[in-house]
Structure formats: C-alpha cells, structure tokens
Curated annotation (Swiss-Prot):
The keyword Zinc is annotated on this UniProt entry: yes
Species assigned in the record: Vibrio campbellii (strain ATCC BAA-1116)
Catalysis: reaction(s): 4-imidazolone-5-propanoate + H2O = N-formimidoyl-L-glutamate
Cofactor: Zn(2+); Fe(3+)
Cofactor note: Binds 1 zinc or iron ion per subunit.
UniProt key word Zinc: yes
Domain of life, per lineage: Bacteria
Sequence positions that bind 4-imidazolone-5-propanoate: R87, Y150, H183, Q251, T328
This protein's name: Imidazolonepropionase
Signal peptide: none
Database matches in PANTHER family: IMIDAZOLONEPROPIONASE (PTHR42752), IMIDAZOLONEPROPIONASE-RELATED (PTHR42752:SF1)
C-alpha cells in the first residue's frame, strides 16, 4: 500500500547528533514498503519535485500524526522467544538460598526448558511465544531476531526455527532466525561435546541452510558452554553453507570468543561483560557489533560491567537487546532495556536508542535497509506520544506507543 505520513516530528537516527533531534513537522512518502520521500513542511524549503512526490492525491492512504514522534521501528536483535515450560519456581528457589547446582540436580536449569520444548509441538511453541512477542510489539519493535537452542536435536531445533518463522504469519513483524544448536550440551551427548559439535556441523547446519530456516549460526562460547576450538568448527561449517555467524561471548569469563567472532566477520558478539581491550580492538577492526544484554546482567545480579568506555573510545557500534529467555532474562519489553542500559551501563539515551535502531539493524545484517529513516530504507516505524526520544529511556511503564508501521502498513496500538 502507498502511504503518506503527515505532521510527524521525525527522529531519523541517521549518523550524528542531528539524527537524534526531532525535526519540525515533516512528511514521509511510502511506496511498496519503502521510504520514497522525506520533507519538512516549512514553506519554501521543499523543491517542486519533492512537493509533487508528497502530494496526498498520489497516495492511497494518509495518516496525520498530529505532531507525534516518528522513529524507526525498534529492533530486538537477540531473543530466545520460542520455548516451552516455566522456570518461575527456580527464581523463587534461588531467592530462598537454593544453589544452582542443587536446582540442576532436581531437574531444573536449561535442561528443564529443553525437556519442555522437546515435548511441545510446533503449534504449541507458536502459541506460547505469541504473548511474549505481543509484549515486544507493545514496546515498539518492528523486527526481532529469534534463536533456537532449546531443542538440541536435529528435529527439535528445526521445529523451533519453523515456529519462529511462523510468527510472521501471526503478527505484523519481521522475524530473523538464528540457529543456536550450540547452546548447551544435550543429555544424549553427556561427556561428548566434540561429538555433539560434529553432529551440528555435519547434520544440523547443512539441513538448516538447505531449507533456509536461518540466516545465522550462534554459539555459546563460554567456560560452561563450548570452547574456542569447538566454536571455530561451528563457524567454519556455517560459513561453508553461506550462513552468518554470531557469538554469545565473554559473559562469564574472557575466553577470546569475541575476537574469534570478529575474525569470522560475525554480525555480533553478545553479552561481552568480561571483554578486554584486545577483544575491543578486534571489534573495532571488524564490522562486528557489540550487543549489550542488560536484562541478563540485572536478573543475574552480575557485577562485571561491559567495557563501555573502551567500546566508546574505539568507536565500536553498540546494540541493545532483551535476550528474552526463561532462565536469565524473562523480559518482553525493549524499552525497559533502554532504561537498564542507561542506569546500569551508563549509556546515554542517544546511545541506547541507536542501540535498538541503527546498530541493532547492523547486528542482524540489515544496516543498509533498516534502523534509520532514510530514502530507500524499509518503511518500518514506531509512533510515540512523547516529547523527546530520551523519554523512551527515562520513563518506564507508561504506555506511550501510538502505533507501528511495518513494510508501509499501519498497526494501531492505541490509535491516532
């Protein structure tokens, strides 16, 4: 549908300070899901050609934003949205002093989610994911990445990826899928991590690539996950089959996973609390984005902060995501992550907003088509009843989203 947006205060998130400051009242022309024209309405500023391009008579639908703020659609670039089971009881047990080792002995931890996810059908996984997705949509997202990683068998990982892709048919949202079979060691491979990695490389990755079920492959490279050599084997297999790579790296220790991810031109290295300057320099010398996950940091009551000042000094792009998952970040609100990134990690509101727009798009490989309001980019927007973009990081709980536009189609979240 061709759509004309009128009387919008634009926050384009283009490079520089100007991209963060709301514009005077402006118009945006959309055709075939793309932005085709941008204009302020200051008399005499627009060329005759621009005025013609933005003529309301040339559009099927016109929306008057009545001075509301128009931002790029927010992007959640790291989620574990699809899973079955509930681990609220573990949350309560931990707060009553039960150590994680004891919880795991009682059948809890990540393997409890694996069991529940294996038992669920694809349709059940979709149904369970929708309320979580609805929470993210209510926080202004138009795109989300969704990982597998709770199946840990060929059949169940594929089931998860299919469920994730099916979410696009249920809601107005763009879903990008990532294979995370190397998330944990399944019980069938206990004590045989190398054999499991071989299974991922020989069996799971080729089929996922052949059926186009994911665009990226991720690995939990950590002392309690998979080591550098195992991670590199997965990265090699992913590259061989034309898939991007990403890494869960330096969350609990400094293994060098971020540097490895950068060496393989990974889209992003995520968590990175224990990242050192060598790792930061590797990011600076690559196109790999540093993705911050403040929800997990908060929920786990971590104390090791990611190296924000080093990332700034080396001009490494920083993205922010919910990391929504049942064990360490049960948060379905991306704007809450903006607040956490500012209060816990001391990002500025501008850095935080760029982390869920321009830099989040880069973390998914869409840096040339999403995350910025610019001619030629996807017509994905979020519409807000706020005075300034900093309000998104500053306020928590107020429902300020008016609507979203996905591929040029308007979705009301309270209406105009």
């Amino acid at each position: 549908m061709d759509l004309l947006i009128e009387n919008a205060r634009l926050v384009t998130m283009q490079e520089g300070e100007q991209g963060y400051l709301p514009s005077p009242l402006a118009r945006v022309g959309i055709r075939s899901g793309k932005i085709v024209a941008l204009s302020t309405v200051t008399k005499g500023e627009d060329s005759a050609e621009t005025e013609s391009t933005l003529n309301p008579d040339h559009y099927e639908q016109t929306i008057d934003l009545q001075s509301k703020l128009l931002l790029p659609g927010l992007i959640d670039c790291h989620t574990h949205l699809v899973y079955a089971g509930n681990r609220a009881n573990e949350f309560e047990m931990r707060l009553n002093g039960v150590p994680y080792e004891e919880i795991a002995k009682q059948g809890g931890g990540i393997l409890s989610t694996v069991r529940a996810t294996r038992e669920a059908s694809e349709e059940q996984l979709i149904e369970l994911a929708l309320p979580r997705l609805d929470g993210l949509l209510a926080s202004g997202i138009t795109s989300a990445e969704v990982k597998s990683g709770y199946g840990l068998t060929l059949q169940d990982e594929i089931k998860m990826l299919r469920a994730a892709k099916a979410l696009e048919q249920e809601r107005k949202v763009k879903i990008t899928t990532t294979l995370l079979a190397a998330h944990a060691l399944p019980p069938e491979f206990k004590g045989r991590a190398d054999d499991y990695i071989q299974h991922i490389c020989d069996d799971i990755i080729p089929l996922v690539a052949e059926e186009k079920l994911a665009t990226s492959v991720d690995v939990f490279c950590e002392s309690i996950g998979f080591n550098l050599a195992q991670t590199e084997r997965v990265f090699e297999a992913a590259k061989k089959h034309g898939l991007h790579v990403k890494g869960h790296t330096e969350q609990l220790s400094d293994l060098g996973g971020t540097t490895l991810t950068a060496e393989y031109s990974g889209l992003s290295a995520d968590h990175i609390e224990y990242l050192d300057e060598v790792g930061v320099r590797s990011l600076a010398n690559s196109s790999t984005v540093a993705t911050l996950l403040p929800g997990a940091f908060y929920f786990l009551r971590e104390t090791q902060l990611p190296p924000i000042e080093l990332l700034r000094a080396h001009k490494v792009p920083m993205a922010i995501a919910t990391d929504i998952n049942p064990g360490t970040s049960p948060f379905a609100d991306l704007t809450l992550m903006l607040n956490m990134a500012c209060t816990l990690f001391r990002l500025t509101p501008q850095e935080a907003l760029r982390g869920v727009t321009q830099n989040a798009a880069k973390a998914l490989g869409y840096g040339e088509s999403r995350g910025v309001i610019e001619i030629g980019y996807d017509a994905d927007f979020s519409i807000w009843d706020i005075e300034h973009p900093a309000d998104l990081s500053y306020q928590v709980g107020a429902k300020r989203l008016v609507g979203r536009i996905v591929n040029g189609e308007y979705v009301s979240h309270g209406g105009l």
